[in-house]
């Protein structure tokens, strides 16, 4: 028993040595501040806390060597009957010394830059705001009317104007109520919003806000109706397959002639209905001034890359079409009906303006194709289609 008691006492003496706690004997505890590198976090440990912890541990161990109770943790100290945990990492004061370590691995103090805020949404809002606040430009314009076309699907009119012979053409848009009284050959004075200008600063596109004055047939003499085949297009050209949209009542298409059936008859010079040569008055229009004249009726089959269709052509526009094909004058019109003449017009390209009436398309104007303007329009249309596709499928 004496030997065992001596061994226990020697072991307690060994534990009581301050240098032997938690370290092999002879290895001193580092008194330098301890740093934890986990997740790049630095913890500054004050030397005062380490000294206090060391004294507390030594006193607990010495008191325990003479105590009969159970072994208590050296990190728990009794103070006035209550247990208090004393950490060697305790920091006094309210200031925090915990900071993130720089990416370079150094421990020097630094201030992290503030988080960057997304500027994409704010920039979009600022652009929209600037567009809304962009001051609209209004201008009073005096111009001749070179063409008027109704856009049924949008219930508005598109009008080609020209201020003078030396100025560029102006494409004007207006509501149905404002444009219903405007006709080809009028001279109008309007207050309009400027939509587009040329590189030289000339107005090229407007929206008519008010019609201040409309002088009927007041345009300068010698003006010609603007062609449906030239820019700016009063009605934008379409393809045949697009005409399945029932909202479209009037449009322009570039087609090739396939077949043409031409009939001559004596008709009223006013309403074009058939009229006997001996009649003094047309029973349809009741116009005593109506005279019997040679009239034509034709039904033409045409095509483009997207399909085929039939178009009815009245006398006025049939004469214009025959002139384009090289058949001028009364005698040549009759010769056109010969079967061998068909080779002169089959697959000939033309630009036609058509309007829907009683579920059939009727030609209201015809012109020779301007390939430069039409090609430029097709390129612009294709580019616009690609931009829309990119927005839908970025």
From Swiss-Prot:
Region (Interaction with rad-51): 1-60
Entry keyword set: Cell cycle, Chromosome, DNA damage, DNA recombination, DNA repair, DNA-binding, Meiosis, Nucleus
Residue numbers spanned by region Disordered: 1-30, 56-136
Region (Interaction with rad-51-DNA complexes) location: 60-89
Observed effect of gene inactivation: Mutant animals are egg-laying defective and exhibit a reduced brood size and high embryonic lethality. Impaired formation of rad-51 foci and accumulation of rpa-1 foci in the meiotic region of the germline in mutants either untreated or treated with ionizing radiation (IR), indicating impaired DNA double strand break repair by homologous recombination. Decompaction of chromatin, chromosome aggregation and aberrant number of bivalent chromosomes during meiosis.
Stretch list, region Required for ssDNA binding: 371-389
Major localisation: nucleus
InterPro entries: NA-bd_OB-fold
Tissue specificity as recorded in UniProt: Expressed in the germline, with highest expression in cells undergoing oogenesis.
Effect of residue 35 to A: Abolishes interaction with rad-51, but binding to ssDNA is retained. Loss of D-loop formation in the presence of rad-51. Loss of inhibition of ATP hydrolysis by rad-51
Compositional bias ranges of the Basic residues kind: 124-134
Any GO CC annotation of this UniProt entry: nucleus
Localization: Nucleus; Chromosome
Chain residue ranges for the region called BRCA2 repeat-like region: 28-62
Biased composition (Basic and acidic residues): 1-12
Free-text function comment from the UniProt entry: Required for the homologous recombination repair of DNA double strand breaks, thereby playing a role in chromosome integrity. Acts by targeting rad-51 to sites of DNA damage and stabilizing rad-51-DNA filaments by blocking ATP hydrolysis catalyzed by rad-51. Promotes rad-51 mediated displacement-loop (D-loop) formation during strand invasion between the invading single-stranded DNA (ssDNA) and the homologous duplex DNA.
Quaternary assembly: Interacts (via N-terminus) with rad-51; regulates rad-51 recruitment to sites of DNA double strand breaks.
UniProt comment concerning the protein's domains: The BRCA2 repeat-like region is required for rad-51 binding.
Listed name of the protein: DNA repair protein brc-2
Taxonomic source organism: Caenorhabditis elegans
Lineage start: Eukaryota, Metazoa, Ecdysozoa, Nematoda, Chromadorea
């Amino acid at each position: 028993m004496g030997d065992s008691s001596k061994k226990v006492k020697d072991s307690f003496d060994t534990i009581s040595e301050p240098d032997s706690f938690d370290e092999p004997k002879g290895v001193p505890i580092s008194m330098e501040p301890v740093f934890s590198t986990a997740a790049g976090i630095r913890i500054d440990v004050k030397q005062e806390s380490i000294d206090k912890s060391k004294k507390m541990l030594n006193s607990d161990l010495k008191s325990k060597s003479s105590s009969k109770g159970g072994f208590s943790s050296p990190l728990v100290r009794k103070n006035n009957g209550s247990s208090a945990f004393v950490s060697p990492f305790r920091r006094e004061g309210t200031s925090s010394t915990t900071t993130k370590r720089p990416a370079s691995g150094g421990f020097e103090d630094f201030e992290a830059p503030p988080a960057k805020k997304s500027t994409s949404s704010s920039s979009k809002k600022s652009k929209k705001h600037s567009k809304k606040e962009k001051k609209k430009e209004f201008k009073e314009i005096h111009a001749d009317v070179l063409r008027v076309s109704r856009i049924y699907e949008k219930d508005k009119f598109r009008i080609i104007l020209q201020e003078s012979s030396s100025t560029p053409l102006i494409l004007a848009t207006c509501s149905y109520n404002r444009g219903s009284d405007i006709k080809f050959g009028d001279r109008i004075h309007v207050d309009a919003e400027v939509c587009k200008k040329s590189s030289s600063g000339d107005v090229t596109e407007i929206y008519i806000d008010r019609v201040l004055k409309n002088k009927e047939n007041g345009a300068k003499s010698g003006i010609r109706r603007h062609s449906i085949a030239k820019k700016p297009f009063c009605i934008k050209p379409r393809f045949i397959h697009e005409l399945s949209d029932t909202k479209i009542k009037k449009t322009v298409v570039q087609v090739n002639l396939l077949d043409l059936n031409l009939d001559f008859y004596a008709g009223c010079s006013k309403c074009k209905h058939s009229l006997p040569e001996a009649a003094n008055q047309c029973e349809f229009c009741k116009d005593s001034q109506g005279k019997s004249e040679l009239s034509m009726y034709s039904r033409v089959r045409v095509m483009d890359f997207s399909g085929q269709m039939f178009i009815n052509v009245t006398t006025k526009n049939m004469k214009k079409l025959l002139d384009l094909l090289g058949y001028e004058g009364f005698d040549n019109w009759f010769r056109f009906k010969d079967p061998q003449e068909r080779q002169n017009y089959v697959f000939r390209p033309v630009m036609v303006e058509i309007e829907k009436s009683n579920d059939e398309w009727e030609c209201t104007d015809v012109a020779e194709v301007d390939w430069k303007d039409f090609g430029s329009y097709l390129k612009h249309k294709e580019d616009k289609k690609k931009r829309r596709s990119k927005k839908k499928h970025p």
